[in-house]
Amino acid sequence: MTTAQFYCQYCTASLLGKKYVLKDDSLFCVTCYDRVFSNYCEECKKPIESDSKDLCYKDRHWHGGCFKCTKCNHSLVEKPFAAKDERLLCTECYSNECSSKCFHCKRTIMPGSRKMEFKGNYWHETCFVCENCRQPIGTKPLISKESGNFCVPCFEKEFAHYCNFCKKVITSGGITFCDQLWHKECFLCSGCRKDLCEEQFMSRDDYPFCVDCYNHLYANKCVACSKPISGLTGAKFICFQDSQWHSECFNCGKCSVSLVGKGFLTQNKEIFCQKCGSGMDSDI
């Protein structure tokens, strides 16, 4: 570069014996450089001149002396920091203001440290332990009770009930039948294996049956219609000499008048009203 070329690219003033700044292979006097190229400080809104330290974070700029925590005002130069809603905070202020608190010890969970989340609450990893054995649960399966969280082995040892059918632990829900506990998915009809969880059912010798299977296997049959007589819905029936009828089927075999609550005659296992049965050789 010759002496003739040693001038400010912007104002053309000679730079001989003066401070200057080289930018993109061009020379600028300090005054022109600061006026044209300086960034403006986010804090004080003044230009960051060439003789000042320019600190940059996410395309925002600060003087070195302005780069401070917005809460405690301590310098953040060469120190770790975090941003919250575009505010710069030192790690201590960020932790106090923004970090989660441990559900167990109530202390701050520091940024960058591992935390456990369960049912909307947070724990230090070392605080998230089984209520019984005090061992860290981590990401292992757990069962929660009002008294705390338990690892599966401790829960089974201390609290578990066992299914009467599969003999495995019932961890939630379940059905009680004949003083025994069952998984919902194990409570099935002893005949057809139909799920009885949301169904009406009947029992025989402490075994559950759906209504259809019970009626087919055990229910008495109506002499008149041959259909099962089930007491599940409170249906009324008539019993006479080891024979049963639905109330609506207990009618005269000749004129079909209802015989419920009335006198009747029988002949060859048929029933008749007294009028129709008169003159017949009845069984009674």
UniProtKB/Swiss-Prot annotation:
Source superkingdom: Eukaryota
Entry keyword Ribosomal protein: no
Any one GO molecular-function label of the UniProt entry: transcription coactivator activity
Boundaries of every LIM zinc-binding domain copy: 39-100, 101-160, 161-220, 223-283
GO biological process, one term: positive regulation of transcription by RNA polymerase II
Pfam families hit by this protein: LIM (PF00412), LIM_FHL2-3_N (PF25076)
Signal peptide start-end: none
GO-annotated cellular components: nucleus; Z disc
ZnF (C4-type) residues: 8-32
SUPFAM superfamilies given in the database record: Glucocorticoid receptor-like (DNA-binding domain)
Keywords from the UniProt entry: LIM domain, Metal-binding, Nucleus, Repeat, Zinc, Zinc-finger
Gene3D superfamilies found in the cross-reference section: Cysteine Rich Protein
Compartment(s) where it occurs, according to its Swiss-Prot or TrEMBL record: Nucleus
Protein's job: May be involved in the regulation of spermatogenesis. Stimulates CREM transcriptional activity in a phosphorylation-independent manner.
Record text on subunit structure and interactions: Interacts with CREM (via the third LIM domain). Interacts (via second LIM domain) with SPAG8.
PANTHER family in the cross-refs: FOUR AND A HALF LIM DOMAINS PROTEIN, FOUR AND A HALF LIM DOMAINS PROTEIN 5
Annotated protein name in UniProt: Four and a half LIM domains protein 5
Taxonomic path: Eukaryota, Metazoa, Chordata, Craniata, Vertebrata
